Amino acid sequence: LADSLREQLDKRLARLKQERDSNWLPEWQELSDYILPRAGRFNTTDVNRGQRRDKKIINPRATFAARVLAAGMHSGMTSPASPWFKLGTPDPGLMQYGPVKEWLYAVEKAMREVMARSNLYNVLPTVYGEEGVFGTAAMAALPDERDTVRFYPFTCGSYMIANSDRQQVDTLYREFKMTARQMEQQFGKEALSQTVRTLLDSNSEAWVDVCHATEPNDKREQGRKDNTNMAYRSVYWEKGGDKDKLLRQSGFQEFPVMAPRWDVLGEDVYGTGPGSQCIGSTKALQLMERRKAEMMEKGVRPPMGAPASLKGQRASILPGGITYLNDMQIGAKFEPLYMVNPAWIGQLRGEIQAEEQIADTAFFVDLFLMISQMDSVRTAYEIATRKEEKMLMLGPVLERQNDDLLDPCIDQVFHLMVEQSISRWMGLLPGNPLLPPPPKELGNLDLRIEYTSILAQAQRAVEGGSIERAIGFAGTVANIKQDPSALDLLDTDNALREYFKAVSVPPTLVRSDDAVLAIREQRDQAMQAQQMQQDLGAVIQGAQLLSETDTSGNNALTQLAGAV
């Protein structure tokens, strides 16, 4: 007999878990112990446990560096304080069409408002932090009745992922706990097992093991559009509950999970990050701190040597304490057996500082705190040059974030907003749509995403700088030659548009080609009218002078008239 859906899910969960635990879990546990002790959930029993988990950490430099990375990535890539993405069309000419440009700008603004209302900006720093330390992070963007979309982060060790044939994550399984009350709220009482129903009456806050799978729907029936025949299925079931019983089965048209990976090698499913690069130095740092503390304690409380006659007698090493020695015993002294060489403490501190620098370098602290760490005042040009140099090191990481995290996130938010708006465009549901109806010129075109965050702008600063230098050089040549024809080679309209694009000027501030042409035609007409008025004035003035000229005498005018 063929396995039921529940049995298939249980078997695949076991296979994915075994692959993850045997290959990746030991390293993740070590990274959690030494860098992010509060992150990672390697047993379902770890939920809601508040005891200390940092007992292996003496020097938390790597923890602080990971915090700087998470804050720097969030502020630099997805800061809610400024627009960090904009939409476009594959056809650049279509972008110059007024209605299309206005619609895209309105959609961008509406999407930013939805993202700000949701919990996205609370979740992203956690995602960046876990990705930097463990190399892989995961979160889901699910529909929400109140905020349109809500984001759910999954900590390391609580989920398993798998790749598609395109080496993109298309499967996520996870094991987690819910209280009996939460299960009733989410799935309804009728879907719960008898055990959980009993807990609702006896202890509604008791924790229950739940499993969730989101994966491609291989049992999809083409042509049907109900929630069990969508491209991806989402299935919840109670671990250890009634056989073949599911808590809920639904689906998604788009994969709702974002699983960014810092760096991936070949066919690997999970990634590696800066945490893996500096874990050795971080462990060495803890050992050095322990040895430094031992050395300093030996200096403050050294091992003591005393005459045998003091055995069993009162002796003191406290400040101001007195220990009396036998006068008859020659050479008997009460003194330290080992004196610490202070130079070793300074040398050990230097080694500790070197190991700390390795952690800072691994987590790009020198990039995100570049200005504050400069030892002297620098010019703005030098700071900008250094920033461009540092961005070269972070460039590949940013490109992977765009592909694994930000593109799917924006696509999912846009998809959910379109779903909310379609029925309201058609008048089937009351209320205002989140998005305005698109202009007919867009048709079925796919939109293009362009990132305008601080880090993205810093990467494009090279392009803007080259345009500035080109225009400046052309102006210098024209000034030296005292000939404006040197500027004929420069297409100023195109130069301005490319520069505005490089520095991410809002599209509403840049006029379309048609608007610019209309302004120039109006200006030319005004100049022509002014020139005609000046010419007409000259003709009138000439006629007036001619009418006042004396033609009775012998002068040039009478001679000319006579000759005619």
Where are these regions (language model features)?
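Short, hydrophobic/amphipathic alpha-helical patches that form generic packing surfaces
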Residues: 33, 37, 66-78, 279-290, ...
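Charged, amphipathic alpha-helical segments
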Residues: 114-124, 206-218, 478-483
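Long, contiguous amphipathic alpha-helices that act as assembly "spine/axial" helices in icosahedral shell
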Residues: 61, 66, 97-143, 269-304, ...
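C-terminal anchoring/interaction modules
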Residues: 1-39, 43, 301-564
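Generic hydrophobic, helix-prone segments enriched in Leu/Val/Ile
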Residues: 68-74, 123-131, 210, 257, ...
